[in-house]
A protein has these predicted regions:
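Catalytic cores of the polymerase beta-like nucleotidyltransferase superfamily
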Residues: 1-397
Length: 397
């Protein structure tokens, strides 16, 4: 039974009543009821997990060319972002509205689907992955729930629509999505039939692109609690993580103040290496770089080079403490001792600047930068004891 409070929350949701959203409905709802908001925004509103968003998904009976024509007449920018799948994107003020024509799959290969357009809302719902994602809202906030997804959503139950094996055969990425949504919306409690289906499919995932898998894993690793889920993925044969990594991830999650993507990636880099992780999931240079810095800081903390860690990596120091604790197996007392030491130090300041070297005859450029870097490393190696005079006396021209 859907609580009345959840339905009321949907009707008065800020994202729904904002002028830009209502403008999209007015633009596309010529005969009334022809367009509905769909998916995550509706799902998360029902369980009071909405956040400020600049993007909303819509489903419509209108074909893409008609959506584009109506947008053009209204002076609304429109972009054919996924036209082969019936999707165009409208830009209404600061709202990005992804509008997709009602569809049903006519051919799938486990990665992509060929679709045909239609006007049957239930058929459109049936082609989606999980019941909690097949939820729609009209312009007035009235819920349309053809498959009982709202009850599953409220209960935190991630259930495949129809036959789980068939849903996975249509798009094998749904194996990863099953685990991610169970971690984010299912409280890490698995639907038994769904878990059996993804286990059966574990041997057929090699054809998935690293980018698509990486996107799912990145989102999963940024969730507060994923330890149970990662363990289930390993047992199902979906993830091939070595046991030390599984152990580190478990310790990290149990003791970290705010578990997050960056720290978990640092643990993965320690176990799998940067190159292996980059190849496996095609993660961005920013993600890998931040994880590497965090891991380097953690290694310094493990070696009790605490001042150096604080000086070189202040931006990732909090994550580095938790990563070091997981890798080294620190007790809470040991972790508290490191934190106490950090709180009691004053982060040193490198006493030499580029201007100092210019005054000594250096010209601006790579040579100056290299010499400044050499002096800084020498200063760090001295445990920050060398002063400005001693460093300048060591200049190499």
């Amino acid at each position: 039974m859907i609580p009345q409070s959840a339905l009321d929350r949907l009707r008065r949701a800020p994202w729904l009543i904002r002028p830009e959203t209502q403008q999209v409905f007015a633009l596309l709802d010529g005969a009334g009821g022809r367009t509905r908001a769909v998916g995550g925004i509706v799902r998360d509103t029902l369980v009071d997990r909405t956040r400020e968003t600049a993007e909303i998904d819509f489903a419509t009976e209108l074909k893409p060319d008609e959506v584009s024509k109506r947008a053009a007449v209204a002076g609304v920018p429109v972009y054919p972002t996924g036209i082969e799948h019936g999707t165009v994107t409208l830009k209404v003020g600061d709202l990005v509205a992804e509008v997709t024509t009602l569809r049903e799959d006519v051919e799938t290969d486990g990665r992509h689907a060929k679709v045909k357009f239609g006007k049957d809302w239930t058929r459109d719902a049936e082609r989606r992955d999980f019941t909690l994602n097949a939820l729609y809202a009209r312009a007035d906030g009235t819920l349309f729930d053809p498959l009982g997804g709202a009850d599953d959503c409220i209960a935190g139950y991630v259930r495949f629509i129809g036959d789980a094996d068939q849903r996975i055969a249509e798009d094998r990425l749904r194996v990863y999505r099953f685990f991610r949504f169970t971690a984010s919306h299912g409280h890490e409690k698995f639907d038994p039939s769904g878990l059996e289906a993804v286990t059966r499919a574990a041997g057929s995932l090699d054809g998935l692109s690293a980018e698509r898998v990486g996107s799912e894993m990145r989102r999963m690793l940024d969730l507060p609690r994923v330890g149970t889920t990662l363990g289930a993925m390993r047992r199902a044969g979906v993830l091939e993580f070595p046991m030390p990594l599984v152990d580190w991830l478990g310790k990290y999650e149990r003791h970290a103040h705010r578990p997050n993507l960056n720290a978990r990636l640092a643990l993965l880099v320690e176990s799998l290496g940067s190159a292996g992780l980059r190849e496996r999931w095609r993660l961005s240079n920013d993600d890998i770089g931040s994880a590497e810095r965090t891991l380097t800081a953690a290694r310094l903390l493990i070696g009790f080079h605490i001042n150096e860690a604080a000086y070189r990596f202040p931006a990732v120091l909090v994550d580095a403490i938790d990563v070091a604790a997981a890798i080294a197996g620190w007790t809470e007392a040991g972790k508290s001792a490191v934190v106490g030491h950090l709180e009691g130090i004053e982060v040193p300041r490198f006493p030499v600047s580029g201007n100092d070297l210019i005054e000594k005859g250096f010209s601006p450029g790579p040579g100056l930068g290299a010499e400044l870097d050499r002096l800084e490393k020498k200063w760090i190696a001295s445990k920050f004891r060398l002063d400005k005079a001693a460093l300048l006396a060591d200049l190499k021209r």
